[in-house]
Amino acid sequence: MSHLLEAQHLIKRYGSRTAVDGVSLEVSPGEIVALIGPNGAGKSTTLEVILGLRAPDGGKVVFWRKDPQREIGIQLQATPFFRGLTAAENLRLFARFYGVRLTQAQIAALLERCGLASVARTEAAKLSGGQQKRLAIALTLAHHPRLLFLDEPTAALDPRGRHDIRILIRSLAATGVGIIFTSHDMEEVGKLADRVVLIVAGRVHADGAPVDLLARFGAASLEDLYLDLTADKE
C-alpha cells in the first residue's frame, strides 16, 4: 500500500453518544498531517482507536504492514523521560524498552540529529523547555520508527523553540517518516502541515493542504477557517 496508515470510516460510541462518527484519514511516507479540532471533538478518541487503545465500533485501521507497533513512535505532552538521568542515558534506556541496543555512536548521532549533542550529559530536569521537547521526540526515534504521533509538539515554547522543533519535524519527514500531530495553534499548523484534518463533533469537516482549504472555504487564514467551521461547537 502507498500509505503508512489508512483509517477508514471509524466509529466509536460510548452508550448513546457517538464520539467518532465515520472519520477517515491517511498518512503517506514523508507526509506531515495536522489533526485539529475543538476540545472534545473526538481527536483523542480517534488516535486511541488508530493506536489500538480502544476497539472501534465500526470501520477499520490499516497499516503498511502487519504488526507495525515496533515501527511506530508516540510523543505525548507529558514529559516521558526520567528527570534524574542525562539525555544520553534516557535515550539508551528508552531504546531498551523497544528491544534496541544503541551504541555510543548511535546515541551521539541521534542526539546530534535532534540538536542535543551539547547537552548529552545534562540531566533531563536541567534542560530548557525546548530541549526537553526535542528529547521527547528523540526518545520516539530510538527504535527507528516509520510513523510518528506527536501531541502538540510546539506547545508552551518560545519562538526559537517552536522554530527548532519545526526544523526537526521537517527533517524527519524528509527521510520518509510519516507524521501526524495535534495542535491548537493554527499558525504553527500552517507553517508545518502538508495536510490538515479538522474534526468537529466526531466528524471530518475539512481535509486538505492548507492553501487548498483556504481557497475552498474562502478563508483568509487557518484560524478564520477553524473559527467558521467550529462555530457553536466549542
Spell out what each predicted region is:
Residues A55-R70:
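Conserved ABC transporter NBD signature motif
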Residues R92, R96, L102-V119:
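Conserved ABC ATPase "signature" region
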Residues E123-L127:
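Conserved ABC ATPase signature
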Residues L148-D151:
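Catalytic Walker B motif of ABC-type/P-loop ATPase nucleotide-binding domains
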Residues V189-K191:
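A short, surface-exposed alpha-helical micro-motif characterized by mixed small hydrophobic
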Residues D207-G208:
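ABC ATPase "signature
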